[in-house]
């Protein structure tokens, strides 16, 4: 009887951790961000807040292009799917926010967006070349905001989502925001499950207890 041959996980891992393969994946992954950034800065109605918010996307693109090649990458296809939906869901989310209505003075969400951008820029600069969308071991980062929470980029993202709800409220905006928060929280847990096989990250988890908000969660 013939047997079905399955792919060798170690060979596939070796393939994914090849520098040129990782670089190619990174370039493909940031393509939607590049397109979004182009439309953002060519928009005749570009505001100061949206212009500043684009800075963190620029940092994302640069660090992804020059990111460190991982020593391990998850081979779980569900984790890759989650990373895809959570990452690009945020980009898609902004397309729906203009359909809502503000429920507070515009200065409030504008201030929150600037706060979220500051958090994410600080976190992205601190993370540096260890960035990635799917769970991968690119070196453990403990500097900057990572001294206080384990997922500061997501923390900034949560603040931004809350700001957009206040600025462009609608049932759809609220529903999408809640779904995205849930996906990012799940992504955080999955990333930690993968990384804690590294003793250095396991020790980091005991030192920094909170995932998103110091002293809270």
Where are these regions (language model features)?
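Membrane-anchoring alpha-helices and their flanking helix-loop junctions
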Residues: 1-134, 163-217
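Active-site-proximal inter-transmembrane loops
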Residues: 134-156
């Amino acid at each position: 009887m013939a047997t079905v041959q399955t792919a060798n996980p170690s060979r596939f891992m070796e393939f994914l951790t090849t520098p040129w393969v990782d670089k190619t994946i990174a370039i493909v992954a940031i393509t939607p961000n590049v397109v979004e950034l182009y439309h953002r800065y060519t928009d005749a109605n570009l505001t100061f807040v949206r212009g500043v918010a684009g800075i963190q996307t620029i940092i994302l693109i640069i660090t992804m292009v020059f990111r460190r090649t991982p020593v391990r990458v998850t081979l779980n296809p569900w984790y890759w799917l989650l990373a895809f939906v959570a990452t690009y869901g945020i980009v898609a989310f902004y397309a729906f926010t203009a359909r809502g209505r503000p429920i507070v003075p515009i200065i409030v969400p504008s201030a929150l967006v600037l706060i979220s951008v500051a958090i994410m820029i600080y976190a992205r600069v601190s993370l540096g070349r260890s960035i990635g969308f799917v769970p991968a071991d690119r070196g453990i980062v403990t500097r900057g905001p990572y001294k206080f929470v384990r997922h500061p980029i997501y923390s900034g993202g949560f603040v931004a989502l809350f700001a957009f709800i206040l600025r462009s409220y609608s049932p759809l905006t609220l529903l999408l925001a809640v779904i995205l928060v849930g996906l990012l929280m799940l992504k955080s847990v999955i990333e930690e499950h993968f990384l804690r096989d590294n003793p250095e990250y396991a020790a980091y988890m005991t030192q920094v207890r909170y995932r998103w908000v110091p002293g809270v969660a």
